[in-house]
Amino acid sequence: MPSFDVVSELDKHEVTNAVDNAIKELDRRYDLKGKGTFEFKELTVTLTAEADFQLEAMIEILKLALVKRKIDGKCLEVKDAYASGKLMKQEAVLREGIDKELAKKIVAHVKEAKLKVQAAIQGEQVRITGKKRDDLQEAIAALRAYDSGMPLQFNNFRD
């Protein structure tokens, strides 16, 4: 029986490259030169600047760098800014994996579409199985049209 997996993964090397590009862009910008920093550790980017408006500009620089490296901006979760001495700090977390709630929504969406496929939650991925490859392609089209709030990839196709 043909099947595929729905996952939400990030290419860690591309994320590192995007953060490095954002750091270079920060050094190039005249209005932000020497006023802010990016720190990247384990899918968390900590932004440090002197004021709120600089943090907002830095978030936009980071989002642009991610998009240039073909990483969907939906995976970036920006937390609230907080004061740390004279500086303002803000964290941006890169989310990866499908949590239980999103997996349930994906399964429900597949069932609502009334396709001839079955969806099963398997940890941080959803396995979709069907009798024909055409049914799986319809399921992929339905999931691409669905706005889940997370970037979805389809892999592990089996015939």
UniProtKB/Swiss-Prot annotation:
Q: Which positions are tagged coiled coil? A: none
Write down the superkingdom of origin: Bacteria
InterPro entries associated with the record: DUF520, UPF0234-like_C, UPF0234_N, YajQ-like_sf
Sorted alphabetically, the keyword list is: Nucleotide-binding
What is a single cellular component term in the Gene Ontology annotation? cytosol
Name the cystine pairs.
none
**Record bears the keyword Nucleotide-binding:** yes
UniProt function note: Nucleotide-binding protein.
This chain belongs to the protein called Nucleotide-binding protein PSPTO_4393
Which species is this record about? Pseudomonas syringae pv. tomato (strain ATCC BAA-871 / DC3000)
